[in-house]
């Protein structure tokens, strides 16, 4: 195979005019935004949950911070494992599926489910560590998986010759998510009506965003099936 600039050229304007591109862009942007929003508050969420444990109730702030530092460090390390596993696992799953959008649907449904679990159990307020960890680990897995499966999704809709261009354009969503994810979380936490449960207020917002992402990627799949 020899690279031919004439036949391999793709117009960026043409790509940007396609609804399918924007459906993918929105879904990718939301997945990264939610992942960054949760990661940015992860230590504080764990801090609040662990503070409710009886063995830590009477400790001074300094002793409490020292006592839980190892636990938080371990959780962050396991987070990285789930992020890596999500990248490998979801990309492997996508190789066995006819429609690549299905992987994103699985990621978003999984993320919605674990967020709803927090809402219905009030896991942060009730110090249900297992439920909080399930949310942190699975959302992190989806965060990594959404990134690793993006190229094959773009290949499916725009062709192999355009992957570099479409991938570059879609990665602009990562840049915007980097600007908005942490700020979104900080805004929601700072303006929560009940400051005693300020971190729990973030979860319904993430749930709503994941629903929008699921709708967006489902529309992409619908348009792809029509074509």
Where are these regions (language model features)?
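Extracytoplasmic gate region of multi-pass secondary transporters
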Residues: 13-91, 151, 178-185
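Membrane-interface helix caps of multi-pass small-molecule transporters
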Residues: 88, 92, 96-97, 183, ...
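Small/hydrophobic positions within alpha-helical transmembrane segments
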Residues: 30, 78, 82, 110, ...
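A late C-terminal transmembrane helix in Major Facilitator Superfamily
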Residues: 143, 157-193
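C-terminal transmembrane helical hairpin of 12-TM major facilitator-type secondary transporters
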Residues: 34, 70-83, 88-153
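Juxtamembrane helix-start elements in MFS-like secondary transporters
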Residues: 55-76, 100, 128, 132, ...
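A membrane-interface helix-boundary motif in multi-pass transporters
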Residues: 187-209
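Multi-pass alpha-helical transporter architecture, strongest
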Residues: 175, 207-227
């Amino acid at each position: 195979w020899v690279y031919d600039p004439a036949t391999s050229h793709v117009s960026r304007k043409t790509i940007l005019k396609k609804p399918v591109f924007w459906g993918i862009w929105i879904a990718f942007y939301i997945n990264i935004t939610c992942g960054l929003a949760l990661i940015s508050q992860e230590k504080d969420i764990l801090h609040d949950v662990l503070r409710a444990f009886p063995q830590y109730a009477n400790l001074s702030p300094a002793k409490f911070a020292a006592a839980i530092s190892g636990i938080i460090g371990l959780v962050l390390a396991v987070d990285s494992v789930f992020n890596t596993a999500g990248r490998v696992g979801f990309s492997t799953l996508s190789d066995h599926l006819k429609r690549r959008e299905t992987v994103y649907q699985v990621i978003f449904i999984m993320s919605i489910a674990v967020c709803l679990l927090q809402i219905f159990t009030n896991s942060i307020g009730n110090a249900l560590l297992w439920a909080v960890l399930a949310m942190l680990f699975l959302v992190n897995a989806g965060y990594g998986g959404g990134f690793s499966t993006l190229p094959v999704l773009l290949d499916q809709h725009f062709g192999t010759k355009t992957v570099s261009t479409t991938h570059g354009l879609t990665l602009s969503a990562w840049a915007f998510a980097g600007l908005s994810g942490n700020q979104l979380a900080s805004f929601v936490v700072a303006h929560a009506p009940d400051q005693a449960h300020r971190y729990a207020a973030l979860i319904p917002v993430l749930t709503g965003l994941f629903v929008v992402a699921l709708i967006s990627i489902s529309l992409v799949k619908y348009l792809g099936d029509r074509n």
